[in-house]
């Protein structure tokens, strides 16, 4: 079959690469894709927001399935437009994508269906928000309601820091409309894990658990980012805890969405905190994680094209999804100034080819002449594969040592928590 991937980041590079080696897939298109994706997909210079134009292309080229990578097209209703045109799509409707598009929607739904998460309040008035902070005390978490590219969360260790975050968001300075309402929630102690699942509206099949590293600096210091590295499988989410998360979180949420008249199709991403009381929801995302995808998909043994088509058509079977008994690690190489700013146009030196034991996914690069240059905050995702996590990490950092660009920054402690 022919599959079209929407997006141009590291996550989409990983999806297109994995689809290109799936037996059921004969051709992959990428809209718009990136120069680095040329070896696994045909690039199509269409803006997804011109939906009529996109649908015409898909029909003219007899594309069988569309896979939506980023959150913005989902929240804008791309899946709905494709449904109306009769094109199968892996990705939730606009209504279902609110699970990520609105923190308030997600928290209220969890409360209604008793899905374990942190206690919270919702505010659009600065004074009321600050009263809640004063009453609750720190540490406390302040989140922008809308989409903020993974950066709309402040874990405040003091009341002053929380108040500053509220001022910043509710003033409209920081995230504009996305921050005009905030969710303030209790701080949950524990270790985080990401559990992604394939969903066809009713059936939920979990992927291998991974662990993301959100903060920019080693030791989980500095501001939050879209993610600085991941590894899988994550030992913190044992089989017992994963089963518990499925029974108390993912399956009830998918059932709740169906009951609310917005069945969920695609990848459901549960960001979990493993607390003393068991797994609780930190956040839901309505798509594959970035960079979780870069470690999860290389460990998949099933046919990704077949699995995604089954999700899109309501025919998902648990036995379609199998995992390799090995590990993967990803280290993100970011540009100078990230996450506040990003330096573009710096030449990337080093080997960017793919090996059996390591892959490089391009998050923010551009081809100029015969070399790649930086073109975003997160530039490359360097992935190492191995029989165990130590081997995978060694291979990852070995590759990192042979790549350089001006102002390159990366974390040297990805995966360290797995060895504690």
Q: In which residue ranges do the predicted regions lie?
A:
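Active-site nucleotide/adenylate-binding loops and adjacent lid/helix of ATP-dependent enzymes
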Residues: 4-5, 100-181, 211, 235-251
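Peripheral (often C-terminal) accessory segments that flank ATP-dependent C-N-forming ligase machineries
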Residues: 310-420
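Solvent-exposed alpha-helices and their adjacent loops that cap or buttress functional pockets
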Residues: 21, 36-38, 60, 90, ...
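Active-site "cap" helix and flanking loop/linker of ATP-utilizing ligase/carboxylase catalytic domains
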Residues: 246-268, 285-355
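Internal nucleotide-binding/catalytic subdomain
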Residues: 156-293
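General beta-strand structural signal in soluble alpha/beta enzymes
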Residues: 30, 67-68, 89-92, 119-122, ...
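ATP-binding N-terminal substructure of ATP-dependent carboxylate-amine bond-forming enzymes
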Residues: 1-95
